Amino acid sequence: MQMTDIARMAGVSASTVSRALSGSPLIPEATRTRITELARSLNYRVNAGAASLRKGDVQTIGVVLLSDSAQMISDPFLLGILGSLTDAVNEQGMNLLLSRLHEDSKDRMRSMVESGQVTGLIVIGQLTLHEHLNELAHLGIPMAVWGAALPDASYPVVGSDNRLGGYLATRHLIEQGCRRIAFFGDTTHPEAGQRFQGHAQAMEEAGIELDPRLRQHFLFGDARLRESIDGWLNQQLDFDAIFACSDVTAISLMGALRERNIAVPSQVRVVGYDDILLASHVHPPLTTVRQPIAQAGRALVDLMFESVAGAPRRNIVLPTELIVRESSL
């Protein structure tokens, strides 16, 4: 249940509902009472953070990193997103409260908003919490999420076209003559799952059968990444290319290949994802799918404020571009 739903039932605007539930004297008492009783009958919870924002009290946006236990907050892509968000929040004259939550502490997201600690939430990543995020949206918790746009999502999402990115990366490798293409990414996560869909589509179009031995489940920013890579390479499987779902994984792979005297790109071509700053400075420079991090922060803040105002939910899909460098040529 969202503020726009109550507005539709009451025959008023979302801003009128917002003012009525915050006790604004600008709304006639009879109207305030009618809207308040309707909201109570529907078990709609007033967002203390949003009410405080309207009164000018709360000047803080909560930024939540949904992290696996092994994921490092120092991951370059996460740091890039945080930097972009900080700039966008500062432009609004507000502050940022950063929290790192695991699946077992997910209920803190709701309490952060309902207690008035923050105005709304910007959530980085979805992990396997898609249904929980939907529940929060139905409770009227204002938020915007960085991740994959899913068909049944009730919350606004900002992200790149992950399926297209996976398709472009794999098609490029196929065009270079590759046929035994390994995929590195944890497909239980929505973003990596969509990238694998694009990878599989490109392989199918080229008439290349997927080899399950070349599909490796690696978490974004896993601290045990190098250990896992070494274990996989020690199997001595036949492959001529690798598409990794993050640049950090791709760069780690290139280091492991170099230690085994396997040359990139003459023996194995490598493509990453994200286009972090380091991607163009490693040797050889890394071909990657660029996510426009600089645009992400502003888009997330815009959607979060729209959610606070009770505006209809929408998604923003940022441009997805393959950046070709030496690692795949």
List the model feature ranges, each with a label.
Residues S67-G80, L98-K106, V158-L168, F184-D230, ...:
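Hinge/beta->alpha junction and helix N-cap segments in small-molecule ligand-binding domains
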Residues R226-L329:
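Flexible loop/turn connectors
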Residues V64, I124, W146, F183-F184, ...:
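Short hydrophobic segments within beta-strands
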Residues T60-R171, W232-N234, D238:
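Alpha-helical recognition/docking segments in bacterial nutrient-uptake
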Residues M1-Q59, L329:
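N-terminal helix-turn-helix DNA-binding module of bacterial transcription factors
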Residues R180, L210-L214, V264-R269:
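Short acidic capping loops at alpha-helix termini that bridge into adjacent secondary structure
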Residues S13, Q59, T119, C178-R180, ...:
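Short acidic/polar active-site loop segments enriched in Thr and Asp
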